Amino acid sequence: MAKIDLLSLSWRRRKSTKPSNGEAIPLSFYEMWDRVSQFAAEIRGSPFMSEMMERRAKFGKGGTMAALDCATLYALTRFQRPKIVIETGGFIGFSAAFILKALADEKLTTARLYSIEADEHCEHWALVPDDLRPQLVPLRSKVEELARGDQLPSTIDMFFHDSSHRYRHMQWEFREFWRRLGDRGLLASHDVNMTRAFAEFVADTYAHDKRTELLDYDRTRHHEWGRWGYIGFMIKKAAA
């Protein structure tokens, strides 16, 4: 029996849908769903995934992502092809390993991942493979202190949140790093189910037509957004 890609199917249906005023909603990022799905499938069946899951099991699963979310993060990074990435909550480097693997697979040899971890007692970035470390910039500090200083790039291509999931802290990180993203920059977050912070942040970027009460794409401040597993993401649309 042929397999049906439910994710792609749902978005094909969306692509054919028009609002009541007859104007098609722009779907310039429609193709990303097939590409992200393909990248995620590739990494899930790869020796790298098997190796990282073995490392995770030996080290302890606490505070690390499961395979689905790792594959999603890897796939989003490959799709985005960022030159500068910032992640918070770097911890023992499990998520960093998948970001760095995506950069390597896209042959982005000059790209850099700034990984921030405030916990002084964990084994920082212990799970990052040696061959992926050259593109890692480890930062042991509170993100608030780094944001006030000049140690972080003012312009970035991708941000990944996985530090404290307290509501107000998530809100603050989203605002702080959203402003550093340019047009088509990617903001992603783990554990978006923990609070309403991500859902609210997405909602705040929407604009609606007063007459039709449908999406006003020109005034909306994102190109696309979604959730896959426990990772949510947004692609920024800068003001014209």
Placement of each model-derived feature along the sequence:
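Rossmann-like AdoMet
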Residues: 1-64
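S-adenosylmethionine/decaboxylated-SAM
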Residues: 59-240
